[in-house]
């Protein structure tokens, strides 16, 4: 069926009425009166558990949310994506990051062309190159083994590889991986400073080989290599992820060190492609293929499971409920796993660049809020930074906890148990809170004077009823990481379909690039600032004055 705008609007109205009148208000009571609540509001895919029972939903909520997904034609849009249709309508492109990890199908067609042989060819070339670097068969210009790789990219060419490489640290042997993204010269200076050009490989990740931040840093790195080893050494110390073969050749990188990808792969969905080359070098081709396999398992589940048993669909529906119906403008991603410390930033781009839109697929203003602000830090660090606001602040911010049942350090299992206890305790505390009577009783148990009890007790009250969901997997390994990232990719897709927006363009990013290009000659003093707004003129003048001081 097609998207039914009338039915969708009516279901949204029913959801808003339900939220105002009959959604759970007291989560303690919801659990105490309903022993089956956890069982009904949780799902598993193998070892991966998704629990949303602490969110303020009941059976009526879930029935209406399923009705919403049907009216929005989530299933039809999903089928169109997997079929290679051009669902990115503003750029007239297919959206097929799922093909990058598909090892089971015989064909996936884009405009009549089977892309799977192309994907396999690039993946096999990546594996051969990664094995060559890791084994020492591919050496630097002086004959030394490569000990360090530096990936230069930005946005999707950086956030995914950084996140995945850090997450899979237990699977590293060598070489060491470093990442440069910011145009700020301090970033590349600090990265290159302790390294030796003779044992360093630099990967330049830019599809067009024109991204200003990436190419500026690449030229700096090229000079660093050439000044020490000579111009002839450049080719042995660089590789590129790009489709602009002429520009790559002009830079000095041989064609056999260039790895391409396709316009049906968006930047923030590209870690599965050649953009993942630094990840593959760091953890090895076998582990990278397990990473792809985990994502593919989630793809198959998302494609085939019925709506009410589908993890990405249910995660997306809860996300929509929190954003559009409950009115929560933010969501916090809290992985209780230090190696997932860059996951919140990765999901921030995935979600906010995808669903930070204000017009519908047909170019009309949206009728309600779209993507939330996404942010977070790993636990337990976040508990000592911003959890105060999450517990007692005036805004309700849903949390998404992620934790593994087992850590990678068997001799430190007691610390992992403490980590898990903190995760579950925060989830419970946000839901249950603490009443004024409980706060009084706690203080009275310390034999404090009655006047002090009455003065302090209100400060120790927690409203509770603050929603959170929890994802638990066995262990953070390549397969589990791939599955987790694919879960969030498809969740973004589901929310976008209900919002009625295009999750696969990013025109807001392009605007900033255009203005930065225009302002560079002004900031460098080659052009005047006249014609700019008064604020920009004043800022430029101040910068010029301080640079001369």
Swiss-Prot record:
Keywords: Cytoplasm, Gluconeogenesis, Glycolysis, Isomerase. The keyword Isomerase applies. It catalyses: alpha-D-glucose 6-phosphate = beta-D-fructose 6-phosphate. Pathway: Carbohydrate biosynthesis; gluconeogenesis; Carbohydrate degradation; glycolysis; D-glyceraldehyde 3-phosphate and glycerone phosphate from D-glucose: step 2/4. The keyword Cytoplasm applies. It is found in: Cytoplasm. GO terms for molecular function: carbohydrate derivative binding; glucose-6-phosphate isomerase activity; monosaccharide binding. Pfam families: PGI. The active site is at residues 353, 384, 513. Its EC number is 5.3.1.9. One of its GO terms (biological process) is glycolytic process. One of its GO terms (cellular component) is cytosol. Belongs to the GPI family. Catalyzes the reversible isomerization of glucose-6-phosphate to fructose-6-phosphate. This is Glucose-6-phosphate isomerase.
